[in-house]
Amino acid sequence: MPPIVISWLTGFISGLLLAIPVGPVNLTIMNEGAQLGFRQAAMISTGALLMETLYCGVAFTSFASVFNHAFIKEAMDLGSFVFMLGLGLWFLKAKAVRNPTKIEERLEQKFRPTSAFMTGFVRVMGNLGVPASWLFFAVYFDSHHWVDPAPASKAACVFGVTTATGLWFFGLSYAAALGHKKFSDRTLLRMERGSGIGLLVLALAHGCQIVWQMHHSHHL
């Protein structure tokens, strides 16, 4: 399979895993879609998608290359495992849908978004878990060569993230407008836990690889 296709698939799968968990953006899309229709929810989705893509693009094109030093790379590799494990457990143990954080609320008070587009944009901007997640994923994908260092491959990965996130946001917008918020909290939590299981599987595979590398280096 060509590296650029692998990069796109990597971005698509990781984008979907991070888009599904229920947070303020998904709840806003659902509520607005149910009350004001698809167009309103789609504009929120567009703003949220743009900010998500910007965070992801910066992580893959700027910060990932900073961690190329061997020691830093190993530390970040271990950090990525801990991060994915923790995030997966957090999603898996979710018992209620999350409300906006204090940072998100402060940003909304400061920027006072007057359009649906800016509401989605600011909601993602204030969620510091988004850039943190993409930073760890960027380092992880780079160190395991899932995303080729070539600019075209990195662009393909970011495009994969945008595609998956966009499909989820706009699909959620359509479903909310069509079904008038027929998704129950229980259904949303099940989807979030499914995403958590996916992250735990990825963390487990990464942990096994770290153990194998340590065992291999010990016997050299």
Regions found by a protein language model. Give the residues of each.
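Alpha-helical transmembrane segments
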Residues: 76-87, 153-165
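Transmembrane alpha-helical segments of integral membrane proteins
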Residues: 57-60, 166-182
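Hydrophobic alpha-helical transmembrane segments of polytopic
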Residues: 80-83, 195-198, 202
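Juxtamembrane transmembrane-helix termini in multi-pass membrane transport proteins
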Residues: 3-74, 136-156
